[in-house]
Amino acid sequence: NQRYVAGGWRGQWDFDSGATLLDWGAHTLDLCQWANGADDTMPVEYEPTGKTITCRYANGVKLILDCLETPFGQRPGWVQALGTCPVRFVGDEGWVETGDSGGIEVQPASLKAELQDVTGKRESGLDVATHSRNFLDCVKSRGQTAANSQVMRHSHIACHAAALAWVLNRKLTLDPVKEEFVGDDEANGLRVRPARTPWVF
């Protein structure tokens, strides 16, 4: 089906949740999880609010998924230097935004002094050599890669949970250990689609 190739799969429920959450979310949520020290869990609440989905972790940290029609909305030109999937971290003193190109932008400008200390230590998400080195080192050490299957699994489950909150248009509460929605048969029924006989999950 030509509608499913060359980018045509975007916006299709079967492949992209109809809201690009499974596309852009897959590229960005793992970075948010890592920054929150939450690689082994995921948000516990997902609430659609206008054009965003507000997620909350058990530790109180909020994650806001931006579901604008264009991935980055109407942002200034500097966003292009951050790559295709920028993520913004907002704190008490301002914000830091970075993306898969390794570029970093901060506000207020006074944070740029601290940025100089960080930029020498960072590793770009698009740096193939860094990813390859991490993989080869882990082959030798038998250790886990930085973006291992469990890290990515939790990120993807969070994307799917957010997509279901979006589709149902209501707040969902997720038990991250059981990986099921609390007290919500309808949402739980959407976690896995019925398979054609004789296939089962």
Regions found by a protein language model. Give the residues of each.
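Substrate-binding rim/cap in mid-to-C-terminal beta-strand-loop elements of soluble/periplasmic
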Residues: 5-10, 107-113, 136-141
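Alpha-helical packing segments of well-folded alpha/beta enzyme cores
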Residues: 28-31, 131, 135, 155-159
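NAD(P)-dinucleotide binding in Rossmann-like oxidoreductases
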Residues: 48-51, 58-129
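Acidic/polar loop patches that form or flank catalytic/metal-binding clefts of enzymes
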Residues: 38-48, 62-65, 96-99, 144-148, ...
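Active-site rim elements
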Residues: 14-22, 75, 117-125, 139-152
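C-terminal helix-rich "cap/oligomerization" subdomain common to oxidoreductases
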Residues: 56-58, 137-201
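Predominantly a Rossmann-like dinucleotide-binding segment in NAD(P)-dependent oxidoreductases
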Residues: 1-44, 55, 63, 73, ...
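Residue-level signal for well-ordered alpha-helical scaffold segments within enzymatic catalytic domains
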Residues: 31-37, 134-138, 164
